[in-house]
Amino acid sequence: MSKEKIALAYSGGLDTSVMIKWLKDKYDAEIVAVTGNLGQEKEVENLEEKAIATGASSFAFLDLRKEFVESCIWPALKAGALYEDVYPLATALGRPLIAKALVDIALENNCTMLAHGCTGKGNDQVRFEVTFASLAPQLAVLAPLREWEFTSREAEIAYAMEHNIPVSATKKSPYSIDENIWGISIECGVLEDPMTPAPEDAYQITTSPEKAPDKAAVIDIEFEQGVPVALDGKAMEGLDLIVELNKVGAAHGVGRLDMVENRVVGIKSREIYEAPAATILHFAHRELERLTLEKSVFQYKKNVSQDYANLIYNGTWFSPMREALDGFIEATQKTVTGLVRVKLFKGSVTLLGRTSPWSLYNEDLATYTEADTFNHKAAEGFIHLYGLGLKTWSEVKANNS
């Protein structure tokens, strides 16, 4: 009788390397190790060799970068999704895609169980397992970090050495870091004190604003229906565009974010983020919307943006709610086409200009010069009707005082 198979979300780090051996022994199962590339800069070479040497029966490496940009990042950008008005949701956007890829590989390989390396007090366990429930409820889910006997990194290293598991036992960074093309999440260590400034060694890619160039960078960003398509007049694929903005933005100290956020599991957590491209694109996109969206649509969309950010953060990407909100958002983006010019200087993003064939700004109506075409006399009747309700309320209040 063939053994059961477990599909494991594998990073090659200490936790998931130990996990291969631990799961294999505990469940007497074959392990299918799965790694997804979302644009992280950390070493991805030799992962297959390492996974097999650790005990995996097979390994799958999936380049998900293009799908991540087109299916996850662009919808979130068009939605204006910033969790609690700050976090551009880099990690939160990536988890459902990795979970979906894990499910796909599991089904292809006739696996009966799914496993991940998320901790028991974080958001990612929710994001993975809610996605599993949405896409493959028939598969059992294993979360070793919630149940295994290891209580420290040192205990895991000892287990790895005992079983000849090839892992690095060098001194660990005091920070917990997660990275993809849309941003980097940094936590733990001294960052757990919200009053302590983030040390420079916590930042992975951005230059300190104080040490950034004294000469600003000016960039033209072109959008078509809410999606960025060109930089400085050069048409670019989404992945390349984000890579370039990350490079330029990081050099100028743009994209450093420090927030205390409300986690899914009910606790507050201090997080440091680096997201140069996301910061620049969200800023430019929002300014183009100010120019092209009708007032009531622009104001109502702010509510939708928060709802969209919440569902991403909470792990309900594969949900009817997201599909419904996508319908509204797509309708709003039909006119969000144009060019936005921004300046990057010592950590800041400043608007220099914007233009669009769908611009609702009418200079003849807005001007205070002789070219003014606004009907000033119409204002008197408008104000009378606009304030009629308050006038009536005031009169009734006075009569009953």
Curated annotation (Swiss-Prot):
- List of residues binding L-citrulline: 87, 123, 127, 176, 185, 261, 273
Q: List ligand-binding residues for ATP.
A: 9-17, 117
GO annotations of cellular component type: cytoplasm
Location comes to:
Cytoplasm
- Oligomeric form and interacting partners: Homotetramer.
Q: Which family does it belong to?
A: Belongs to the argininosuccinate synthase family. Type 1 subfamily.
Which CDD domains does this entry report, sorted A to Z? ASS
> What is the source species?
Prosthecochloris aestuarii (strain DSM 271 / SK 413)
| A molecular-function term among this protein's GO annotations | ATP binding
Q: Which PANTHER family match?
A: ARGININOSUCCINATE SYNTHASE
What's the protein name?
Argininosuccinate synthase
Question: Per the UniProt entry, what is one GO biological process?
Answer: L-arginine biosynthetic process
E.C. number: 6.3.4.5
Q: Which UniProt keywords apply?
A: Amino-acid biosynthesis, Arginine biosynthesis, ATP-binding, Cytoplasm, Ligase, Nucleotide-binding
Q: Which Gene3D superfamilies match?
A: Argininosuccinate synthetase, chain A, domain 2 (3.90.1260.10), HUPs (3.40.50.620), Single helix bin (1.20.5.470)
**Main subcellular location:** cytoplasm
Q: In which pathway does it act?
A: Amino-acid biosynthesis; L-arginine biosynthesis; L-arginine from L-ornithine and carbamoyl phosphate: step 2/3
The entry's L-aspartate-binding residues are 119, 123-124
Q: So what does this thing catalyse?
A: L-citrulline + L-aspartate + ATP = 2-(N(omega)-L-arginino)succinate + AMP + diphosphate + H(+)
Pfam annotation, one family = Arginosuc_synth
